[in-house]
Amino acid sequence: RLAPEDYPAERLPELADFYRNAFVEMRSERGFNEPLYEGARDTVERLADEGWLLGVATGKARRGLDIVFEHHDLHRYFQTFQTVDHGPGKPHPRMVLDAMGETGVRAEQTVMIGDTSWDMLMARAANAHALGVSWGFHTPGEIEEGGAHAVHHQFDALNAWLDAFEPGPAKGDPA
């Protein structure tokens, strides 16, 4: 998404590897800060205070996730941490299924919030509610094509959806 439009498609994997390696090196530098999106911390704290069981299903390695969570003091809000270190990555549903298993939550009670089409495909494959956010890696159209039940463009809209959430089969899914 961030590569120039005229960048050769056959070189995209090489560019992605370069970016990944540069990011790992940059993250190891003293004082590096990977900021949260504005509104993310407030939403996490509110949901935890209201008794939501929170989990992470990420394409990051556990080491990278821990660096971000330690920097922002987020571990205490989450009950399950699913990373690509222990099984297939997205869009395979294993991370969501493992998170549900660890927390004792059923699919109809589960909401996967993500910023990629792969998050939506993973959620749908696990029969969970698939909510997209437009401020991340994929475009809203790509997220919708991945099967999002809804795509939100601001935390206020996401929070309103979560406030109205009632467990049950995801919209458009069989009961």
Explain the meaning of each model-derived region.
Residues 1-52:
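N-terminal helical cap/lid subdomain that shapes the substrate entry/recognition surface
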Residues 10, 46-48, 52, 61-175:
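Asp-based, Mg2+/Mn2+-dependent phosphohydrolase catalytic module
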